[in-house]
Each structure stands twice: as C-alpha cells, then as structure tokens.
Amino acid sequence: MAKNIKFDIEARDGLKRGVDALANAVKVTLGPKGRNVIIGKSFGGPTVTKDGVTVAKEIELQDPLENMGAQMVKEVASKTNDLAGDGTTTATVLAQAIVKEGLKNVAAGANPMDLKRGIDKAVEAIVADLTKQAKVVGSDSEKIKQIASISANNDEVIGELIANAFAKVGKEGVITVEEAKGTDTYVDVVEGMQFDRGYLSPYFVTNPEKMDAELENPYILLYDKKVSSLKELLPVLEPVAQSGKPLLIIAEDVDGEALSTLVVNKLRGALKIAAVKAPGFGDRRKAMLEDIAILTGGTVISEERGFTLENTTIEMLGTAKRVTIDKDNTTIVSGAGEADMIKNRVNQIKGQMEASTSDYDKEKLQERLAKLAGGVAVLYVGAASEVEMKEKKDRVDDALHATRAAVEEGIVAGGGVALLRAKNVLKDIKADNADEATGIQIVSRAVEAPLRTIVENAGLEGSVVVAKVAEGSGDFGYNAKTDEYVDMLKAGIIDPKKVTRVALENAASVAGMILTTECALVEIKEENAGGGQMGGGMPGMM
C-alpha cells in the first residue's frame, strides 16, 4: 500500500484537527450540566450516552491523518477507563488543552523535546501534590455514596445502592452489575461463599417448595477425585451417621453405585446428605477446593497429599453453620475455618493478583478473594426501555469503578478544583532552559481546562469562574449544579484521586507524543479497479 508522507506543521496540524474533533464531541458530556450524545448505529436503535469513553470509541474520521490524531486521544480515554474506570472525559479535555498550547509554542519555534521534558516535570509535581491533597475514604458510607452519585451523573439513587453494596461486602467483595427483569434497580447480596454447582440429584432436596437442599451445621467432605463406589465412602459415612449431623460431599463427581446408594439413604431418612461437583476446572478447581477447606476448617482429601477416602477421619471434614444448595448454586454460610488461616489465604491471593498479567486470571482471583473475604453483591439495573437500560448500566459501571478507585487512593475536591490547586506547586520547579519552562507553563494552563469545560457546559463564561476559584484556597470551588461557590468536600463534590491522577498522566503522555511528531505516514486509499459485476447464479441458488 502506497503511503503519503506529511512533515512538520502539516503533520501536526492534521493530528490536531483529529484531536479537536474527538475532544469536542466528548467534552460536551462533562459536569453535572453536561449534555447527552446520541450515537447512530447501522443496526438497531441509537444509543444515548453521557459516558465519555463510549462516545470516544464510536469515533472514526474520514481523513486518515486526522483519524490518527483522534485514535491517539481515544487511547487516552480507553486507558484511563481501564485503569481508573472513570475520568475519561477529563483525560480527553486535558489532552486537547496540552496539545493546543504545545503546538502553538512548537509553531513559534520552541524545541518539542524540551517542551515534553517540561510537561513531564510538571505532571510529576502535580501528581505528588494530589497525593498530599487526598483524604482517605475507608468505609465511610456517606463519602462512598457521594462519589458513586457524581460518577453516575448525579444520580443519588445509584449512589445509595452502591454505598449499601460496599457496606455489605466490604472493599474486598465483588460487586457485579446485571440487568433486572423489571424497572426497579436494587442490590442482592450473597453472604458466605457461593459457587456455581448445584445438587447432583433432585432427590437431595429438603425443601420441595423452593426446590433447594438446606443442611444445618453439616460436615463437609472435600475430595478432588470422582466417587463411584460406596465402599470408598463407608469409613466417612459411619461416624457421620452416628453423630446425627448432615453431610455435604464436594467431589470432582459422584456417580454410579455411590450416588444411587446416597439417594436411597436420604429417601429412607437414614442420612441427611447432599452431593455437588467441585467448582472450576484443572488447577483452578484444586485452588477453589483449598479455599473451601480453609473457610470450613477442613482438609482436601487428595492422593497428591497422601490422603485417601479409606483413611479419612471425621476430624478432616470441614463444618459450617448452614449450606444451601439449589439446582445451580451452592452457598456455604459461616464456615468454621480459623480467621488467621483465612487471612493468610487472602494475602496469598492478593499476591497472585499483583503478579498476574492476565486480566482473566485477575478477575477469577478477585472472585475467589471476594468469596473468602467479603461476599458477592449483584446490582440489578432496571429501566423502562432497552435504550435507557444501556445508558443506566454504563453509568452504574462508571460509578462502581470510581468508588473502587476512591477506596484505593482516597478522594480530592471535585469539579476540577484539585488540579487547579495543584498548579501552585509548579512555581517552584526549576527548569533547565526556557523551552522547558514553557512546557511547565503549558501544564499550568491546561489544568484549568476541566473546570472551564464544566462551567461552559453549564452555560456560563469559563474564564470568570476559573479566575474566582483560583483566588480562593483549599476546597473552595464552583458547584455547576446549583450555580454557587461552595466548599467542594462539604458539598459532597468529590473525585477519586486515582481518577484525576490517571487522567492527567495519560493525557500528558499522548499529548507529548503528538508534540514530538515530525513526520506522519498515511496510507493512500486506492480506488477500486472497475471490475464487472459478478454473474448471477441460477434463481433460488444461495
């Protein structure tokens, strides 16, 4: 494919046009009075959204050079979304501001490499100041509600639900978002450890109305192989039957003679018993069995460890306060495992998460962590129409990620105030030359952009409000929702520090690349050679 080569100002100007096209479409969504963007699809109905990254992902420009600029800023939005879960619009606005100021100076003869060094120094100083500004959230329900509400575009109902979910499962817990069947939005919390395996036979059911099996204070046998013959199980069944307690068998599988005999014993009332398959596959199954063993104070019966069913004693079985099994899931509540052992296992899983490079593995480890340490909450999102459902679900996802980020790194004043306050530290940075000093100034001006955009979206003059907020100190800022100057933290207008930090770092990174671009290679689209139409087949032929 032939390439068109663009140099110098021509290359950078083309990239800038692309940056502006994408950023202008995204930034209308910023702030409490941000507008909606409607996205037409070639199939299905249009999507209405106020989510920056959703808008960014849909943008493809016709001019290939402009499209490269747009794709670079799209990368800012996507990466910010991946790392922090929110702040995509802020990141896009910052990138546009740095590119705009930077290209002015490059056109005036500044050295792009020195500008970039100045920008990097300024960003480092601002991030350090944001860390000083940050306040710890911990498990403060009110703060969690405020953060979630803001990220869900000032929807206090969603904020309340997410705060409730966090209160119930803790920061180690897993909160997932599902579509509700009706129009109500609500939280459903699963206490204890739940895994997606149901009873192996409906004859194990103890509650025919609900079609589930409930075992009170059962013994739990954990076995990593298949159980086919009853003879293997007898050494365990006899002492359990004498104790009068129920028994739950979790094994790779239970079939044949073993399963039919267990069912007969259950139906005769000789033994309260249920059997389920072990969760997961391969190595993950072994790890999850070990998790259940630690949670219930039992031992996994595994030949790898020198244990067989024949020499299993009742002391090797786990116990729990209650186990509920339906056709799809098993839930173990209040396992009798030692707190120290559970804590060590949690730390071990956290270490594996940090070392893992696979998103899938991390997600599975996070699920295991939640089942051990916290619990699982499902946030069901209800809406009257499919379009509203999609939009609401996007907002709930954003709010959830922002809340996690806040719990992780703390909160700062929202509404663009934290960045505006942080720019005061830039006066003390020593620049090695004039162009580096200009790079620092570029960031100093760019950090005003989020507040300016919020104000302009509210229909007011950005410069006036920015000047007034800059005169103030601490958390003094502008509440665009009520058109008042307030203490941002007291008014509940807060941002997760992680979101603000990641947005600035990603914006500066991509803007720096655009500023230091001297040449762009663009593919020349070849016109299709005028070939004849394909001949028609016989009628009715596919």
Swiss-Prot record:
E.C. number(s) listed in UniProt: 5.6.1.7
InterPro entries in alphabetical order: Chaperonin_Cpn60_CS, Cpn60/GroEL, Cpn60/GroEL/TCP-1, GroEL-like_apical_dom_sf, GROEL-like_equatorial_sf, TCP-1-like_intermed_sf
Gene Ontology cellular-component annotations: cytoplasm
Organism: Flavobacterium psychrophilum (strain ATCC 49511 / DSM 21280 / CIP 103535 / JIP02/86)
Cell compartments where the protein resides: Cytoplasm
GO biological process, one term: protein refolding
Subunit: Forms a cylinder of 14 subunits composed of two heptameric rings stacked back-to-back. Interacts with the co-chaperonin GroES.
The reaction(s) this protein catalyses: ATP + H2O + a folded polypeptide = ADP + phosphate + an unfolded polypeptide
Top-level taxon in the UniProt lineage: Bacteria
Broad enzyme group: isomerase
Protein name: Chaperonin GroEL
Taxon lineage: Bacteria, Pseudomonadati, Bacteroidota, Flavobacteriia, Flavobacteriales
Annotated GO MF terms: ATP binding; ATP-dependent protein folding chaperone; isomerase activity; unfolded protein binding
Pfam families hit by this protein: Cpn60_TCP1 (PF00118)
Gene: groEL
